[in-house]
Amino acid sequence: MSSMFVYVWGTVTDLLHSACSVLALNGDTESSGEHTAPGDTRHGHSSCPTDSRAMEEEEFEILLPEEPEEGTSQDPSPDRSGGFLGDEGTLQTLWLILVGKSGSGKSATGNSILGRRVFESKLSARPVTQAFQQGCRAWEGRELQVIDTPDILSPWAAGWATAQGVGEAGTGSLPKQYAVLLVTQLGRFTEEDQQVAGRLEEVFGKGILARTILVFTRKEDLDGRSLETYLRETDNRALAKLDDVCSRRHCGFNNKGDGAEQETQLRELMRHVEGVLKEPEGCAYSPPATPQPHAAPRESWGLWWLGAKEGRGDQAWLWGLHRILKEPEQAGRQLPPSTPI
């Protein structure tokens, strides 16, 4: 009987001890909840109900992202312009040569391509661009070298090139990757524009127009119509013929547009440039060897047509172009960041 009492008493004691332990544990839990509100992040931790295992897995996913799927390529590091560097960390260079008559919007188009104001552009009775100018930017894996040229028909064009020492330029070849952009104003394609196209063939040789892109400024004047429709319905036969000769590579530019619009315009232009680079013999051009010209007398610097008849005008413009093309190669280039115009 006594042994039975001892057994029962021991069992009751064990049960009471277990109950006290449970009550103490619940009290600690409630006390902890009184001092920490949901969402409190004191001591660097969040008290939101989060499973510790789930949190560890989430942190692991952030630190170690999933491996790319098989067959997908890993792009190299992007540059500041959104483009990508080459295998050796250098950008491929592409030259864009702007040509056209005075007032066509060459300089403004160059600024739109560069994404910032580099070339002087304003309304003037006298040609604003009287010298070959150069600007550059990085764009999607390429270094774009933009050349703004004097009016190829202007009397100041030959004068500047000769004064800068045409004889120093020497013979040579244009860059391996380049495109000629013939800039004209929408709705104002005149006989002078036809002369520009003819002068291009005189300077660069037959076939250059097949690797030239027509760039129409004042795209906003289309009032919602497409450039394709405008060119298809134009009654300007000279313009229609030139468009055909240029393999119908054309695009429009609104040089007053915002950044997004100008980026879209640049992408369309570059699509045509890629087509030019795929043309047979379109990636390189070497001018024929000619006697090295001597500086003309100052009195004749302004006589463009006289220079052309004597074989100096075309050479002066071409040698001026060669000079500006060589200058960036002789000195280290630093690509300025693209900033709004």
From Swiss-Prot:
Stretches the record annotates as Disordered: 28-85
Pfam families (UniProt xref): AIG1
Compositional bias annotation for Acidic residues: 56-72
Compartments (UniProt record): Cytoplasm, Cytosol
Residues covered by region (G1): 100-107
Binding positions (GTP): 100-108, 121, 218-220, 255
Record-level Gene Ontology MF annotations: GTP binding
SUPFAM superfamilies from the UniProt entry: P-loop containing nucleoside triphosphate hydrolases
Residue span of region G5: 254-256
Keywords, sorted A to Z: Cytoplasm, GTP-binding, Nucleotide-binding
Taxonomy, superkingdom: Eukaryota
A GO cellular-component term linked to this record: cytosol
Keyword Membrane: no
Residue span of region G4: 217-220
Family under the similarity heading: Belongs to the TRAFAC class TrmE-Era-EngA-EngB-Septin-like GTPase superfamily. AIG1/Toc34/Toc159-like paraseptin GTPase family. IAN subfamily.
Descriptive protein name: GTPase IMAP family member 6
Gene: GIMAP6
